[in-house]
Amino acid sequence: MVNEQIIDISGPLKGEIEVPGDKSMTHRAIMLASLAEGVSTIYKPLLGEDCRRTMDIFRLLGVDIKEDEDKLVVNSPGYKAFKTPHQVLYTGNSGTTTRLLAGLLSGLGIESVLSGDVSIGKRPMDRVLRPLKSMNANIEGIEDNYTPLIIKPSVIKGINYKMEVASAQVKSAILFASLFSKEATIIKELDVSRNHTETMFRHFNIPIEAEGLSITTIPEAIRYIKPADFHVPGDISSAAFFIVAALITPGSDVTIHNVGINPTRSGIIDIVEKMGGNIQLFNQTTGAEPTASIRIQYTPMLQPIKIEGELVPKAIDELPVIALLCTQAVGTSTIKDAEELKVKETNRIDTTADMLNLLGFELQPTNDGLIIHPSEFKTNATVDSLTDHRIGMMLAVASLLSSEPVKIKQFDAVNVSFPGFLPKLKLLENEG
């Protein structure tokens, strides 16, 4: 990775932009289009490093995936014709690829090995392996907890499973494995987590029932799958950086078009509204994956907030940049119930606090979150993304509060989810 990036951007930020396609939906669209025999087209996908790893793996399984301007054309022989891979399936830095394919490949019964980069090797997989093994999956990890994951053929059984954590990745691994079971599977969630797998199953003609915190699949649901075209909305997790940037930079007025506002993902909008931020939604569409244009204007005197409970899984990936936003509130804010942050690309509780504290902000890490005090940018210490794309972008947004350039090590980690992030931020500066 590039050792150091100097961020020298000042406000106000003004203009209208779109952000790249949603990462979670792009992964799932590639997976489902690859399972279905025939041609599916995925419009405006995210072609960052993570989603490319998912594409690479399905190509090794025998799926033809072509990139054509702003779309992917997936021509699949169908899951029954998948090849047995004769090399390790490399998932890179992608937890979504690793965990969802652990379930899918177990269901398919394809002998394979999943392995990622150093970061993935440090992220626990037991939360996925436990339910998969209860489904009779033949899957093992190093010390039964870490990659590489070794998968061998088995006959998957349906289960009645109560989730241990509010994790869309764990839920989705179970759901993908359940497609191949001769029995129904029932999942009971602790809190609502992002439901893209459920909505996209339906889009590709796979029956699934969801009511409240209960999700039920039918036996051998894979037999219903059909190819489908899918339009990927803009990623709200990527939009979050521009939302916060506009809120904290005097004189800013930014509009982001075609952003996915699925209610299981739109926690940042709820949080900004609770803090009194000037945010407006318009051009809203309805459907399984609703979208909107979002206008954000600079807002002084933001109110402090307590972020906890069901709000946390709805904003889990945005919490680092939300923590930065909270430093600009008029009182102390808290984030609780966010243990899930510990098993992301980094322990984001610690990395958020450590990097922002280096710049003079005042954050206290706790076992399950952060205490964030009103504070200002005080020093231009060199900071580090620690190869975590969301930490890198959060630090770039923090630089808007500085009168001097900020140096960020390993900044090219942002390419995992947002190639072109910095040019887009500079575009708003130039228009301002």
Swiss-Prot record:
3-phosphoshikimate binds at residues 23-24, 28, 167, 169, 317, 344. Keywords: Amino-acid biosynthesis, Aromatic amino acid biosynthesis, Cytoplasm, Transferase. Phosphoenolpyruvate binds at residues 23, 95, 123, 169, 348, 390. Pathway: Metabolic intermediate biosynthesis; chorismate biosynthesis; chorismate from D-erythrose 4-phosphate and phosphoenolpyruvate: step 6/7. GO terms for molecular function: 3-phosphoshikimate 1-carboxyvinyltransferase activity. CDD domains: EPSP_synthase. Its main location: cytoplasm. Pfam families: EPSP_synthase (PF00275). It is found in: Cytoplasm. The active site is at residue 317. It catalyses: 3-phosphoshikimate + phosphoenolpyruvate = 5-O-(1-carboxyvinyl)-3-phosphoshikimate + phosphate. It is an enzyme of class 2 (transferase). InterPro entries: Enolpyruvate_Tfrase_dom, Enolpyruvate_Tfrase_sf, EPSP_synthase, EPSP_synthase_CS, RNA3'P_cycl/enolpyr_Trfase_a/b. Gene3D superfamilies: Enolpyruvate transferase domain (3.65.10.10). GO terms for biological process: amino acid biosynthetic process; aromatic amino acid family biosynthetic process; chorismate biosynthetic process. Belongs to the EPSP synthase family. This is 3-phosphoshikimate 1-carboxyvinyltransferase. It comes from Staphylococcus aureus (strain MRSA252).
